[in-house]
Amino acid sequence: MDLIQQHINHQLSFCATAFSQVNLAAEWHTLQLQILPQLTQLALSSDYAIKILCQFPHAFWQMFEQGDLAQAHPRPYYHQQLTKLLADKTTDFLWMQSIRQYRQQAMLRWIYRDVNNLCTLAELTDELSELADASIDAAIAYAIKPLQARY
């Protein structure tokens, strides 16, 4: 077995373990049956993406089930998602943790779509830009009330 195949096998084994640890072994099997070439390309292309996939197996499974891996997210998708996600975050820690994890999951999706030629460069950069804009808007909205009260 050559080094590339060993690397792919190691990465996919790492994913299988992560899915099994959160009781998603059957879902991992389904992913392997339906998108193994794409998972292989992801494993070859990005150690970071595999790391994030293994950190958030539920999120990746949900992206797959909902068809998010195969379709673009038109504006104002990220503004709407961040508004919902961050609405109940009342501490700096929870707010920052939530937005960081959301960004990591979005990056996993973008890398998956990019390395598998499932999106155009224009779609990818538009989504990246919108998430950046939405993140800035969310940070301003979160910070403005305490700042107004203070000053």
Regions found by a protein language model. Name each.
Residues M1-Y151:
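Non-catalytic regulatory/linker segments of enzymes
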